[in-house]
């Protein structure tokens, strides 16, 4: 069963791919819809912001009204050389004295030089140029036509903007009564629905949905296991979130989706479905333990990617405020 519908410009995000994922739980025969079935974006052929278009002054004010006592939760992980990293990535910080002591007050300065990948390190925000389906980025932009040594000329992470939205925590690990889901557990639509019911929350248009798997407990404790695989959402859960018109999907693992994917013929299909097809942003490696401990399930979620011109993503330090 292969399902797809054409994305009509100006239509709702749901109309873009309401039936792109088959109803079978395994999705063994699922294929990404071809360019003519997924483009142009519902936000227009020239759109570079994807689901960020769902954020409005009204939605920002609604998110601000969720703040009751002003307690802040830092959702970003510490950045240093001990963190888990994908092959080929590294993090080195070199401290240096840059000036001084100067003047009668003996003023001096210190700076650091950091050698790392700014876009995909630590707690990270995936922009719309991070992944591609064949030759195409989001909105069927041909990667080769916009890729330069100094970055992408379209769909750079600087186009995403800043986010101040309603955030929802769906604690799947707690739902299952475990500290951490199994390595290869694929989160399903019934899991999301049960977590919503347990938390007594609904998912609304423009939300940031944060999914706790417990996998973050391995961070700097067992980096090899953390990187090898992970529990996460599958395609049908991703479709469920798109149907609710979410803006951001985040998790405490490194790819949001289950890895490796059960269908060995698919590689990072949730990335493709959310980023490339629907323009929904991902935030990976979140620290969700304090939110889970305090049972905070609805909050204001704030994240701002670096203005890295032409970048594919950004290290970020999101916060939740209740």
Task: Please annotate each region the language model reported.
Residues 1-12:
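Bacterial N-terminal signal peptides that target proteins for export
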Residues 3-4, 20, 120:
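Exposed boundary/loop context
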Residues 26-322:
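Active-/binding-site microenvironments in catalytic and ligand-binding cores
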Residues 10-20:
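Bacterial N-terminal signal peptides
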Residues 22-24:
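Long, low-complexity intrinsically disordered regions enriched in Ser/Thr/Asp/Glu with frequent Gly/Pro
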